[in-house]
Each structure stands twice: as C-alpha cells, then as structure tokens.
Amino acid sequence: MDTLIKEFDVALRAIAGATRTARANPADRLAPDTEQMSADERRHVAGLMRINHVGEVCAQALYQAQKLTARDGAVRAQMDAAAREEEDHLAWCAERLRELGSRPSLLNPLWYAGAFAIGWMAGRAGDRVSLGFVAETERQVEHHLGGHLDRLPEADGRSRAILEQMRDDEIRHGNAARDAGGIPLPAPVRALMRGASRVMTTAAYRI
C-alpha cells in the first residue's frame, strides 16, 4: 500500500508540475533574458519548452511503469535513479515556461496516461526489452533536443543551458540502459515511437 501511495504521489506531482529538484537549475548562472527576445520569439521558445516539459511528464510515466514491472532489483534501482534526474528536467522546464509567461500543456494527464501504458507494456516484455526501450527513447530524445537547440533564438541562453544539460543526462541514461543489457528494438517499433513523438510535439507546441 505504501508503494502505491508513493507512486500515485509521483504521478500527481508530475501532472500538476509540483516536482522537487535535487540539482540547481543550469540557467541560474545566467542573467534574465526574456526582455531581449521579441514577443514572437518568446512564444516560439515557450512552445518548444512546453514540448520538452511534456517529454519529461512522459519520462516520469515511462520510468514509473518500467520500475514497477522490472524483475531485477538492479534494473528497478536504475529506473528510479534516472527518474529522479528526469524530475529535475521537469522542474527546470516548468520554471522556464513561467519565466516566458506561458504554461504547461493542458493535455498533460493524457500524455502521462498514454506513456504509463506504453512503459507498462515495455516492462512486461522483460527487463532487457524494457532497457532497450529506454535506450531507444533516450536516443530519440537526444536527437529531438539537438533540433530544439538549433531552433532557439541567439538571445535565449537560459533555455539553451537547460536543454544542453538535459541532453547530456539523456545520453548518459541511454548508455547506461545499453550497458545494463538493453537490446535493440525492431525497426517497426522504432518507427512507431517516432510517429507517436511527432503527434505529441505537434499538439504540445500549441496546447
């Protein structure tokens, strides 16, 4: 029962944006920069950061489901450690959205539920498949973050600092999953993941 209560609390905090951070925000070392951007640039950056916030909501759901279904204690601990770092990402993105005068996606409950279901299925397929799913997810997220870094206005150093740290963390999580025995996913599964990501990013940019 205690475990269920704890995991329910994790879900509520992820959806509501009431997450805790263990690490300082990488943007804290930089001066405020929103006034150096035009209104259109701020709206564009807010759309990108909303996408990244949704991605971190989904990461919380995926890791939570995969942790609950993991057979091996070491895999469970690895999922838990990665989820805590992803919680930092979630809080950093939420803070940047507030600075930009924007808000998270209104569809966060839907994103969370869908990601949890996918993570549960991956976890039920076995630890090596689950770790392979983590590795592929992080590879796609790394690519996606690189694209966002290329699309940021030159004046937006604070978002850049956040996304660069997130990308470094995602690379490390993916490498750890492969090193722990994650197996490559079939090409159709990878393509399906990319398709689902495109749907999410298109909707989250605006809603």
Curated annotation (Swiss-Prot):
Keywords: Cell membrane, Iron, Membrane, Metal-binding, Monooxygenase, Oxidoreductase, Ubiquinone biosynthesis. InterPro entries: COQ7_proteobact (IPR047809), Ferritin-like (IPR012347), Ferritin-like_SF (IPR009078), Ubq_synth_Coq7 (IPR011566). GO terms for cellular component: plasma membrane. The keyword Membrane applies. Binds 2 iron ions per subunit. It comes from Cupriavidus necator (strain ATCC 17699 / DSM 428 / KCTC 22496 / NCIMB 10442 / H16 / Stanier 337). Catalyzes the hydroxylation of 2-nonaprenyl-3-methyl-6-methoxy-1,4-benzoquinol during ubiquinone biosynthesis. Gene3D superfamilies: 1.20.1260.10. Pathway: Cofactor biosynthesis; ubiquinone biosynthesis. It is found in: Cell membrane. Its EC number is 1.14.99.60. It catalyses: a 5-methoxy-2-methyl-3-(all-trans-polyprenyl)benzene-1,4-diol + AH2 + O2 = a 3-demethylubiquinol + A + H2O. Pfam families: COQ7. The keyword Metal-binding applies. It is a peripheral membrane protein. Its main location: membrane. GO terms for molecular function: 3-demethoxyubiquinol 3-hydroxylase activity; metal ion binding. This is 3-demethoxyubiquinol 3-hydroxylase. Fe cation 1 binds at E56, E86, H89, E170. It is an enzyme of class 1 (oxidoreductase). Its cofactor is Fe cation. Fe cation 2 binds at E86, E138, E170, H173. Belongs to the COQ7 family.
